[in-house]
Regions:
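Low-complexity, intrinsically disordered short peptide segments enriched in small/polar/basic residues
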Residues: 15, 37, 49-50, 70, ...
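Hydrophobic beta-strand residues in large extracellular and virion-surface proteins
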Residues: 17, 27-29, 38-40, 52-54, ...
Length: 95
């Protein structure tokens, strides 16, 4: 289950919350910067090896792929923002 502090760390001006399914321990968000979609799923570290698994898909794609594994929600948010910065830089360099 996500704590109130973890949910607060998901900045609503940077992310659009698509859905939050507390029973399944995941939150689906969209980056307003890149328009990419993300699922932050909390799981059993004994099973997954990490407490949080991050899934990703681009706009127009149907399925998510496993993007990263993290130790906490702040690390997850940082990973998403880093991906957005990379995508923005790559897009700028492709012009």
């Amino acid at each position: 289950m996500f704590t109130k502090r973890e949910l607060k760390s998901i900045n609503k001006s940077y992310f659009n919350v698509v859905r939050y399914v507390s029973e399944m321990n995941y939150i689906e968000i969209q980056s307003r910067c890149s328009k990419d979609y993300w699922i932050i799923q909390k799981g059993d570290p004994a099973y997954y090896g990490y407490p949080i698994i991050l899934y990703h898909k681009h706009p127009g794609q149907q399925y998510y792929h496993r993007h990263w594994q993290c130790y906490n929600v702040n690390q997850t948010i940082s990973s998403i923002k880093s991906h957005d910065a990379y995508k923005k830089l790559r897009k700028w360099n492709d012009k």
